[in-house]
Amino acid sequence: MAKLYFYYAAMNAGKSTVLLQSSYNYRERGMQTLLFTPAIDTRYQYGTICSRIGLSEQAYAFNNTDNLYVLTQELQLQATKYSCVLIDEAQFLTREQVYQLTEITDQMSIPVLAYGLRTDFRGELFPGSQFLLAWADELIELKTICHCGRKATMNMRIDENGQAVVEGEQVLIGGNESYVATCRLHYKRGEAGKTFPGNKLFNKDTNTF
């Protein structure tokens, strides 16, 4: 029986890397995969899933009004049967689109692997993540670390000076220049441990790199 999987994590946990590796594993065995990425993510070339380690793959860029169940049916008519559907940045899905993913698994018997953030910079659930947590068959946490070495579970938004931002719109597309993953303790303290050129972390206790 096909299942809906939600792989969630904080920023920079390698979600896109794991997605691309999973797709490669299917294709290496002669199976077809369908990749989706939200059009709202403008960090990279349109319709491309990119990882921080340099991997990339073409994907179907969807908007929040697209019906992913219908799209999958239509795209499958143009190709052989898909063995897996993979969604990048799944936190941007709408409630309706998460329901459509359940239809892909339940009606088409295709496993769906969704990868995304659990919470925003305010520590609140994204709509897509909320319903994936509620409806997915399997929940898998991908782990990354805070600058202190603890597991990072929070996403801190930072300004150009590396200071924590606590107000603003939920969605602000950005990478390492805008966000940093931290543990809950340093999230509450507003201490980002900002990475500077050369990948050296500034130690706020000793004022040294």
UniProtKB/Swiss-Prot annotation:
CC annotations in GO: cytosol
Query: Would you say which domain of life the source belongs to?
Result: Bacteria
The reactions it catalyses are: thymidine + ATP = dTMP + ADP + H(+)
Record keywords: ATP-binding, Cytoplasm, DNA synthesis, Kinase, Metal-binding, Nucleotide-binding, Transferase, Zinc
Q: Which GO terms describe its biological process?
A: DNA biosynthetic process; thymidine metabolic process
Could you say which EC number(s) this protein's record lists? 2.7.1.21
> Which annotated residues bind ATP?
A9, A10, M11, N12, A13, G14, K15, S16, D88, E89, A90, Q91
For whether the record's keyword set contains ATP-binding, the answer is yes
Q: Active-site residues?
A: E89
**PROSITE patterns named in the record:** TK_CELLULAR_TYPE
Where does it mainly reside? cytoplasm
Alphabetical list of InterPro entries matching this protein: P-loop_NTPase (IPR027417), Thymidine_kinase (IPR001267), Thymidine_kinase_CS (IPR020633)
Subcellular location(s): the record lists:
Cytoplasm
Question: Which one of the record's GO molecular function terms can you name?
Answer: thymidine kinase activity
Q: Carries keyword Kinase? A: yes
**Pfam families annotated for this entry?**
TK (PF00265)
Binding residues for Zn(2+): C146, C148, C183, H186
- Its family? Belongs to the thymidine kinase family.
Q: How is the quaternary structure described?
A: Homotetramer.
Q: Specify the protein name.
A: Thymidine kinase
Name of the gene encoding the protein in the UniProt record: tdk
